[in-house]
């Protein structure tokens, strides 16, 4: 079914890895680190430049503001920078590994042109794919899939994922025709936006994903083995 496409654009959460990974692993890891980051912040600390962009001097208020952004899942670019910094430490220390589905790992390895589009920052995307839990190895082993991925897009590079113009921007940047691209996501609003510029779409139906009311109008993929 995917043989007609030369280029693949992939969402992350709910598509190539469990949707629970962000809310049950990444977000708690970050929120647990926030008090320490804020209270120990000094002018020469690594996160000082990021925290200063919130323009909140009171540390208690700053901490509350950051945690509120996380709780409401606000796509704030400053928050994304801070999360990227914290998650980098987690990945590099071995405390975090991304549970990418085995069929998605195989898919990324065997397809010639694969791009990633996520609301998470490009930096966070590269970290995730750089520290993937190897399904065929002991728990401490990880895979680096970045060499198999041709490019990364986020809300800063391309725009919001629910806006058609964002996909037009991506087509321009990768130099592809809409008819050559298949976009896979668990979010129907994103699929509709991509379809608005003529990109073919597929609905990722993974364990734990929310039911899609009009799911029958999309080509549904429970895994990527058929692609």
Curated annotation (Swiss-Prot):
It holds the Pfam family Hydrolase. GO terms for biological process: L-methionine salvage from methylthioadenosine. It is found in: Cytoplasm; Nucleus. Pathway: Amino-acid biosynthesis; L-methionine biosynthesis via salvage pathway; L-methionine from S-methyl-5-thio-alpha-D-ribose 1-phosphate: step 3/6; Amino-acid biosynthesis; L-methionine biosynthesis via salvage pathway; L-methionine from S-methyl-5-thio-alpha-D-ribose 1-phosphate: step 4/6. SUPFAM superfamilies: HAD-like (SSF56784). It comes from the Eukaryota. Its EC number is 3.1.3.77. Binds 1 Mg(2+) ion per subunit. One of its GO terms (cellular component) is cytoplasm. Monomer. Bifunctional enzyme that catalyzes the enolization of 2,3-diketo-5-methylthiopentyl-1-phosphate (DK-MTP-1-P) into the intermediate 2-hydroxy-3-keto-5-methylthiopentenyl-1-phosphate (HK-MTPenyl-1-P), which is then dephosphorylated to form the acireductone 1,2-dihydroxy-3-keto-5-methylthiopentene (DHK-MTPene). This is Enolase-phosphatase E1. The lineage of its organism: Eukaryota, Fungi, Dikarya, Ascomycota, Saccharomycotina. The gene is UTR4.
């Amino acid at each position: 079914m995917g043989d007609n496409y030369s280029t693949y654009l992939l969402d992350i959460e709910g598509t190539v890895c469990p949707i629970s990974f962000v809310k049950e692993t990444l977000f708690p890891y970050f929120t647990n680190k926030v008090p320490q980051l804020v209270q120990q912040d000094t002018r020469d600390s690594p996160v000082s430049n990021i925290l200063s962009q919130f323009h909140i001097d009171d540390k208690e208020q700053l901490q509350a503001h950051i945690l509120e952004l996380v709780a409401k899942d606000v796509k704030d670019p400053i928050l994304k920078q801070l999360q990227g910094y914290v998650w980098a430490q987690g990945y590099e220390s071995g405390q975090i590994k991304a549970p990418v589905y085995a069929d998605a790992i195989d898919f990324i390895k065997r397809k010639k042109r694969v791009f990633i589009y996520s609301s998470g920052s490009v930096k966070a995307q590269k970290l995730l794919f750089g520290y993937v839990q190897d399904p065929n190895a002991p728990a401490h082993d990880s895979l680096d899939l970045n060499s198999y991925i041709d490019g990364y897009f986020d809300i800063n590079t391309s725009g919001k994922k629910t806006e058609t113009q964002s996909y037009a921007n991506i087509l321009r940047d990768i130099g592809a025709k809409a008819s050559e691209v298949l976009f896979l996501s668990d979010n129907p609003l994103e699929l509709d936006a991509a379809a608005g510029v003529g990109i073919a779409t597929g609905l990722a139906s993974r364990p734990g994903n929310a039911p899609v009311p009009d799911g029958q109008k999309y080509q549904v993929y429970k895994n990527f083995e058929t692609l």
